[in-house]
A protein has these predicted regions:
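Acidic/histidine metal-binding catalytic segments
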Residues: 662-668, 734-742
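N-terminal secretory signal peptides that target proteins for export/translocation
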Residues: 1-16
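Catalytic and substrate-binding regions of cell-wall glycan-acting enzymes that process beta-1,4-linked
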Residues: 507-514, 689, 736, 741-796
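Acidic, polar-rich low-complexity tracts and alpha-helical solenoid repeat scaffolds
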Residues: 4, 17, 28, 32-684, ...
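Leucine-biased recognition of intrinsically disordered, low-complexity hydrophobic segments
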Residues: 12, 23-29
Length: 810
């Protein structure tokens, strides 16, 4: 049975209802509040401990600034439930009034008042109530808390909104440029200077803004403001007029190349481009009316990198048409041709892509570019079913550039094209020689596995075992790869051993996989085979793996940053719900992008306490990938729950009951589709937690009376309801094996039905490996792994039903 839902307020605000005492900065060992685990036992040990770094002495208790055992976001206070409810309803003004009322009745301690004032100021500002926001920010800025700089910038924003730009500079002057908060002050200073007509100061401030922003809508908006200010300055002859106009022209064009820019911003950028051209003298107008070849290449590349392939192809076509014939073979012209072919292939215009690559190969001589073009031409031909042409291109790459990093890729894909043509002997010959011909090639494990898989499919188990033994003896084959590959060769080697009569050796390998790779796809595959052979033995191995997990806390290494003011600011920002700026503070400390598990676990818990499932899950997922051999037992149970969170429980459990879909599968789909980001958007125009496209959502929403527009699909209550409905519809399409709803969710129901017709009654593990779409194949493995993890963590009594995969597809 599914567990009952947690209270809605706890879901929303990250209430501290878990057992983790986490990373303490006030002591080296933190005790854990005991609570009942799902199995009804009391936690044996504190799951988180902070240990001194190996190269430093322990941090004395009296010198530590903060302790996460004392950290509690303001809105988890039960007395502020009305504030949280108003925020959830999207009414920050009501939330501000609720908070003011509560403060009048329950004054906080003097040392804590700044937190409530800062939250109050943020609520007023979000509601557009700038006068009371200014008052509340001023109370914070007059103190000495870690939030003083943020309050001063808040004052500056409020003053600007109230039409008092002259006072903005005074409020912002005390904010150090070395603090992360500085990125917030520059837009305010720029706008204040622009409003006052000080265009030079505005331009300088906007340039500061751009230094802190990467590509995206926010940067595009700042570039647009800078372009406008430059053109305004040029209009009145302030500064170097031609230089200002040309810079504005460049910015306007760059905006049009950036991904995910709102349509209104794009239209404004086009208008600024036209205005800039109009301001140029006639000779310069003619010179700059069209982008020069280098600018055209950058535009095509930007669109291609953003995977906006239709636009990239259109831009490439226009660029090539404008290029003189003599420049087609230049480095710029050749690169545009390559990107054009790549865009055509991405939009499935394979024949045209092949023609473009053929043209490039006839004109361009750069060895690296030719190798890329030959490889891409081969892949386009193979995708178009032109396997002889694909073989020709792959062979040409190997012959012309045998040392190129794509040469072993070409060998693999060429062999697969031979297999598609039924030329088994050549397929075998090419892949058998791959390890010797390309001993350092990164495709050696994959090519060898594909050879072994073919032999397994033909029931040549001895041949498969020999190939896999060679792979497992190759150090490269055990190098770090994505988690869904972990254990693949070991599992199928055991399968081959079992089929050749070495049953006990095979069963021993299955046991090792169960111990070594908890809840991974190939652990589930191994458990399923072992369970079919001896269910009690499988259960005993699982029990021993759990018993082997070390007791005691998950250790977080102490760092000097934990006692610094930057970390203190991050904690305070998380406490008042400003997750974005809190994360920036951690990033400035070099913590947010850490690859060290002991740091990531601490960050994950901090994010969870602050109420961000998205950030918490991301950090924990990275941490768990670095320690994949630790089963979720004792302290590690809560660690795994951070990597596999269960938010929106009331909605999920309601929809699971309504549709007959288990919550473990719903959460697994959600985790793999959006990583728990309600605002997620894909390049295929899929939206929200379960990544629905509008036409699919509309067909499910109509009978339920629910909206299905883009904005509504970003609301968890709508998205989960419709996504679960789609999952149920797909499961009903495969009554003999509802798990085929998983590949159907990714690739559409028609493809799994076709694959079933092509391979009826196939072994389930081989059927999954032979899914022709790489994305779908890997997706199925990840979802099955996540589904089992959710069952283990939240439905333990029912876990075995999720751990045992079907032996056949039907």
């Amino acid at each position: 049975m599914d567990r009952p839902p947690v209270p809605r307020a706890a879901q929303l605000m990250g209430a501290r209802h878990s057992s983790w005492a986490v990373l303490s900065l006030a002591a080296l060992l933190v005790s854990c509040e005991a609570r009942q685990e799902p199995e009804g036992r009391v936690a044996k040990a504190p799951p988180f401990r902070i240990a001194p770094a190996a190269t430093s002495a322990p941090v004395p208790v009296q010198n530590a600034l903060f302790s996460l055992s004392d950290f509690q976001p303001l809105l988890t206070n039960p007395g502020l439930s009305g504030v949280a409810a108003a925020l959830d309803a999207g009414t920050p003004g009501v939330a501000a009034r609720e908070l003011s009322s509560w403060l009048s009745k329950t004054p906080p301690a003097p040392g804590e008042r700044f937190r409530y004032d800062f939250l109050l100021a943020r609520l007023h500002e979000q509601a557009g109530e700038f006068a009371p926001a200014l008052t509340a920010y001023a109370r914070v800025s007059q103190g000495s808390s870690p939030l003083v700089s943020y309050a001063r910038v808040g004052e500056a924003r409020a003053l600007l909104a109230l039409g008092r730009p002259k006072e903005v500079l005074a409020r912002s002057a005390a904010v150090s440029d070395s603090e992360p908060v500085a990125r917030l002050k520059w837009p305010v200073l720029a706008e204040a200077a622009r409003v006052q007509g000080d265009r030079s100061a505005a331009i300088a401030a906007y340039e500061h803004v751009l230094l802190a922003l990467s590509a995206g809508a926010e940067r595009a908006e700042s570039e647009l403001r800078l372009a406008t200010t430059l053109l305004d300055a040029a209009d009145i002859g302030s500064g170097d007029r031609s230089l200002q106009i040309l810079k504005a022209l460049s910015l306007s064009r760059r905006i049009q190349d950036e991904p995910n820019v709102p349509r209104a911003t794009l239209l404004s950028a086009q208008a600024r481009e036209a205005r800039a051209l109009g301001l140029l003298p006639e000779p310069l107008q003619a010179q700059h009316r069209e982008r020069d070849p280098a600018e055209q290449l950058e535009r095509v590349r930007a669109l291609s990198d953003a995977r906006r392939f239709a636009l990239a192809q259109q831009a490439a076509e226009q660029s090539l048409a404008a290029l003189p014939e003599s420049e087609r073979a230049s480095s710029v012209g050749c690169e545009i041709q390559f990107l054009s072919g790549k865009a055509l292939a991405a939009t499935r215009a394979y024949a045209r892509a092949g023609e473009m690559f053929e043209t490039l190969l006839g004109q361009c001589q750069d060895p690296e570019l030719r190798a890329r073009a030959q490889f891409s031409a081969g892949k386009a031909a193979a995708s178009d079913g032109q396997h002889m042409l694909a073989i020709k291109r792959f062979a040409a790459l190997e012959q012309e550039a045998p040392k190129n990093s794509l040469a072993d890729d070409a060998r693999l894909y060429g062999a697969l094209s031979y297999l598609e043509l039924g030329v088994e002997a050549r397929f075998t010959e090419l892949l058998s020689a791959l390890p010797d011909d390309y001993p350092e090639g990164d495709m050696v494990p994959e090519g060898s596995f594909r050879l072994a898989l073919r032999r397994l499919d033909k029931q040549d188990f001895q041949g498969a075992a020999r190939v896999l033994e060679r792979v497992l003896g190759n150090k490269f084959s055990v190098a770090a790869r994505a988690a869904d590959f972990a254990g693949r060769e070991r599992y199928f080697h055991a399968r081959a051993l079992a089929a050749t009569g070495e049953s006990e050796r095979a069963l021993g390998e299955y046991e090792s996989l169960i111990r070594d790779l908890p809840l991974s796809y190939y652990m589930l595959s191994a458990y399923s085979v072992l369970h079919a052979a001896d269910a009690e033995r499988a259960r005993a191995v699982l029990a021993s793996a759990l018993a082997a997990v070390p007791s005691g806390p998950v250790v977080v290494t102490n760092r000097a940053e934990f006692s610094g003011v930057g970390f203190a600011r991050a904690l305070e920002l998380f406490g008042v719900g400003d997750l974005e700026n809190g994360a920036r503070e951690l990033d400035a400390l070099g913590l947010a992008d850490s690859s060290r598990p002991e740091i990531l676990w601490g960050l994950s818990k901090l994010y969870a306490e602050a109420g961000s499932v998205k950030l918490s899950h991301a950090a924990a997922r990275r941490a768990l990938s670095a320690a994949p051999s630790t089963w979720p037992a004792d302290a590690w149970l809560d660690a795994w729950k951070l990597a596999y969170p269960a938010p929106f429980q009331q909605i999920v459990l309601r929809e699971a009951k309504r549709t007959g879909q288990n919550s473990a599968l719903i959460y697994a789909i959600m985790r793999e589709e959006s990583a728990f980001d309600p605002d997620a958007e894909s390049l295929a125009d899929a939206y929200g937690l379960m990544q629905l496209i509008v036409p699919t959502a509309k067909s499910i929403a109509r009978p339920l009376g629910l909206p299905s527009d883009r904005a509504s699909l970003k609301r968890p209550s709508v998205n989960i309801t419709l996504g679960t409905g789609e999952l149920a519809r797909l499961a009903n399409a495969f009554p003999e094996n509802a798990l085929l709803a998983i590949p159907a969710y990714n690739a559409g129901p028609g493809n799994p039905k076709r694959w079933l017709r092509e391979r009826p009654n196939a072994d389930f593990d081989l059927w999954v490996e032979l899914i022709p779409y790489v994305e779908t194949r890997r997706y199925v493995k990840r979802v099955l792994s996540s589904r089992a993890a959710y069952a283990f963590l939240y439905q333990r009594d029912d876990f075995e039903r999720f751990a045992v995969l079907p032996s056949k597809v039907q």
